UniProtKB/Swiss-Prot annotation:
It comes from Arabidopsis thaliana. Homotetramer. This is Methionine gamma-lyase. Signal peptide: none annotated. The gene is MGL. Pfam families: Cys_Met_Meta_PP. Residues 1-25 are annotated as: Disordered. Keywords: Cytoplasm, Lyase, Pyridoxal phosphate. The modification N6-(pyridoxal phosphate)lysine is found at residue 248. The keyword Cytoplasm applies. Its main location: cytoplasm. PANTHER family: CYSTATHIONINE GAMMA-LYASE, TRANS-SULFURATION ENZYME FAMILY MEMBER. Its EC number is 4.4.1.11. Belongs to the trans-sulfuration enzymes family. Induction: By sulfate deprivation and high methionine levels. Up-regulated by drought.
Length: 441
């Protein structure tokens, strides 16, 4: 695996212009696009190093390829595309469920962001997760997963996959490496799945050690990095596949639903195979117009994450000083603070999420009501990564798919408030609003 990581480089393809049919055979195979290394220790630098796509008429922004289907100049070209001889790496496209130039550009950005060879962008985060699991696991297969996960993912693993595909999951405390090792059944377990920073407890996974353990037993490591884009780079730390809900921090506008699968070039090719690829056959296709919107936001993701993280750090420290039970990886009291500090990319802080344990749902709801309706500190809403602060009581919302015993095992108390810290207004202005609401408690 170490050798694989050393040679893993995102692919950046050069452009191709189609001319008329007199140019060679009319649909001439332009020399296969060269791969240019864009790996960089800093994700922002890696994103900046990929080729900038200009518009069709020289616009500084790329054009939106809104076509569902694509024409060819010669009949034989169609056959060559369906046999795999020609494809997107040569700038040949068939149908936008397969590949689309605008979506492919966003995929290149996502690969650069995560430091992987390739990526494929999907219609939602859950479609990315489910497609990966269905590709990597066969009927009768076994998964080991963290007990603390987003509720939708937990439901997929604990209910949907066993019922429809006979794929079972053992849930374990991801910080208990002995339990993880014991849960892996060599020769049967196919995937180790966890979140880089757990939703909603903000437990931090030891990605390098967990990856080492899994690879020793031939298990593929899949990491959901939705909570920590820019902050953590799981693939560089040993993970094989990184999944995202792009709807969150990467979008930043709470207006788009999207996802991504980031991994090796071989994985993406397998998932897009005409006969056996989960992405190809399930069709969780991203709209080109959505891809264009997102591609315009990724260049300033680093700036946004720095401010999310900065404010979350300040708020967490001040909440702690008020005597609140606050959970944030940037606090030295966090159980995995040193671990997280050793894994993060420099200058992006510890992430834009914090959690407050109010002990009971009644107290949690009371605080959130004051914060929204009395002082306008933030909004009661699920999701995260928005420029306004979003807050929800996880046990009764995004983790409601878990039963009481599962919530207890995951460390989700009835009064746990997950807070995605925004950056509108001044820091002191927003803190004053928080303090006023807290004092009313």
């Amino acid at each position: 695996m170490a050798h694989f990581l050393e040679t893993q480089e995102p692919l950046v393809f050069s452009g191709k212009k189609r001319n008329d049919r007199d140019d060679e055979d009319g649909d001439a195979l332009v020399a296969k696009k060269s791969a240019l290394a864009v790996c960089d220790a800093d994700p922002a630098a890696a994103i900046a190093n990929i080729r900038h796509e200009f518009g069709e008429h020289g616009g500084v922004n790329m054009s939106i390829e809104a076509s569902a289907t694509f024409t060819v100049m010669e009949p034989d070209t169609m056959r060559r595309m369906f046999t795999g001889e020609l494809g997107p790496d040569n700038d040949f496209y068939v149908y936008s469920r397969h590949f689309n130039p605008t979506v492919l550009n966003l995929s290149r950005q996502m690969a650069a962001l995560e430091g992987t060879q390739a990526a494929y962008c999907t219609s939602s985060g859950m479609s990315a997760i489910s497609s990966v699991m269905l590709q990597l696991c066969s009927s009768g297969g076994h998964v080991v997963a963290a007990s603390t996960l987003y509720g939708g993912t937990h439901a997929l693993l604990s209910h949907f996959l066993p019922r429809t595909c006979n794929i079972t999951t053992s849930f374990v405390d991801i910080t208990d490496h002995g339990a993880v090792a014991n849960a892996i059944v060599e020769g049967r377990t196919q995937v180790l799945y966890f979140e880089s920073v757990a939703n909603p407890t903000l437990t931090v996974a030891d990605i390098p050690e967990l990856s080492r353990m899994a690879h020793e037993k031939g298990v593929t490591v899949v990491v959901d990095n939705t909570f920590a884009p820019m902050v953590l780079s799981p693939a560089k730390l040993g993970a094989d596949v990184v999944v995202h809900s792009i709807s969150k921090f990467i979008s930043g506008g709470a207006d788009i639903i999207a996802g991504a699968v980031c991994g090796s070039e071989n994985l993406v090719k397998e998932m897009m195979d005409l006969r056996g690829g989960s992405l190809m056959l399930l069709g969780p296709t991203m709209n080109a117009k959505v891809a264009f919107e997102l591609s315009e936001r990724i260049p300033h993701l680093g700036l946004r994450m720095r401010e999310h993280s900065h404010r979350a750090q300040v708020y967490a420290e001040r909440m702690r000083d008020l005597g609140m039970k606050v959970i944030y990886p940037g606090l030295e009291t966090h159980p995995q603070h040193k671990l997280f500090k050793g894994m993060v990319n420099r200058d992006y802080g510890y992430g834009g999420l914090l959690s407050i344990d109010m002990e009971t749902e009644e107290k949690a709801n009371k605080l959130m009501a004051y914060l929204q309706n009395a002082t306008q500190f933030g909004f009661m809403a699920v999701s995260l990564g928005y420029y306004e602060t979003l807050m929800s009581c996880s046990g009764s919302s995004t983790s409601s798919e878990l039963d009481p015993s599962q919530k207890e095992a995951a460390g989700i108390s009835p009064g746990l408030v997950r807070m995605s810290v925004g950056y509108v207004g001044t820091l002191e202005q927003k803190w004053t609003q928080f303090e006023k609401a807290f004092l009313r408690m």
